[in-house]
Design a protein with these regions (language model features):
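Carbohydrate-active catalytic/glycan-binding domains of CAZyme proteins
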Residues: 1-293
Length: 293
């Protein structure tokens, strides 16, 4: 199938042994009870096989609602899935699952979510600092705090648990050059959304974070920069958006031929979402989309 036939949100691509493995949130069950995650497989980013189910909730699973934003990272010889689960009675968050294969089956590895159990959290991603320290970088959601934030927590070296208190890196409202508020009938007032953090280091050593929110033209892909090249730095927001209209929750990967690509979902409309791929250019210690220049 073509990527236009694949109905997922939050695409994430792992490149392994000349093969692209693409994971994502099932759009059909995105906003309700869901039971797992799939993978699509390709050799060229054009024709895809699948979906192949890589995780299915067991009967006694701890979260009965949404399954969101699966990311698969290879670390010390195993494949770790960072995925968000929501429940109707307790706070949701990002857990870590483990497999010996990118095609699963993935099984629960952490004890429920890594993120704080009294926070509403989503979209955990994986980051390893230059000194080898692993972190989960995640969203503390606007649904609980109104001004959504991006936070980080240090992980144990085996990725089994958090070993530090969470630290707030920045709030969505700090992106004063472009961010727009939203309203919601279930929560009075104006709110700022944070979604989908992803870390990328330039050839010059600059640490960039991709993240999503809403701008004047809808869902967006934004850029933030650390001033010390690590997660512990002071983060500043770029007024220039990487992708500005009706698409987001992206990540970066290197193609089999060595080119840099951005994938994200667009449009940001239920049952119409699909993954797209744009070649990226790294210049002046930042990123831009080649096809949009």
């Amino acid at each position: 199938m073509k990527n236009t036939e694949i109905n997922i949100r939050d695409p994430f691509v792992l490149v392994e042994d000349g093969t692209y493995y693409m994971y994502g949130t099932r759009a059909a069950t995105c906003w309700g009870a869901a039971d797992g995650f799939d993978c699509y497989v390709s050799k060229d980013m054009e024709d895809w096989d699948g979906p192949f189910e890589v995780f299915h909730k067991p009967e006694d699973f701890w979260a009965d609602r949404n399954c969101w934003a699966p990311e698969v990272h290879k670390y010390r010889g195993f494949y770790y899935m960072f995925a968000t689960f929501k429940d109707s009675s307790v706070h949701g968050g990002t857990a870590i699952l483990k497999s010996e294969s990118p095609l699963g089956p993935f099984v629960m590895y952490s004890d429920r979510q890594i993120t704080p159990r009294d926070w509403e959290c989503i979209d955990g991603t994986f980051y390893v600092s230059p000194d080898g320290t692993p972190y989960m970088v995640f969203v503390h959601e606007w649904v609980q705090i109104s001004d959504g934030s991006i936070c980080a927590v240090e992980l144990s070296r085996d990725l089994k648990e958090a070993v530090s208190e969470p630290v707030t890196l920045f709030h969505a409202s700090e992106a004063v050059g472009w961010v727009q508020t939203i309203t919601n009938k279930n929560r009075p007032g104006l709110h700022y959304v944070t979604d989908g953090p992803y870390l990328y280091r330039t050839g010059g050593g600059r640490l960039i974070m991709l993240w999503s929110s809403f701008g004047k033209e809808g869902y967006t892909e934004a850029l933030a920069y650390s001033d010390n090249g690590d997660i512990t730095g002071k983060w500043t927001q770029d007024d220039r958006l990487l992708f500005l209209k009706d698409g987001g929750h992206g990540m970066i990967f290197e193609s089999i031929s060595g080119e840099l690509y951005l994938t994200l979902h667009t449009p940001n409309e239920h049952l119409k979402e699909h993954p797209v791929f744009y070649r990226l250019i790294e210049e002046e210690d930042t990123l831009r989309v080649a096809e949009l220049s």
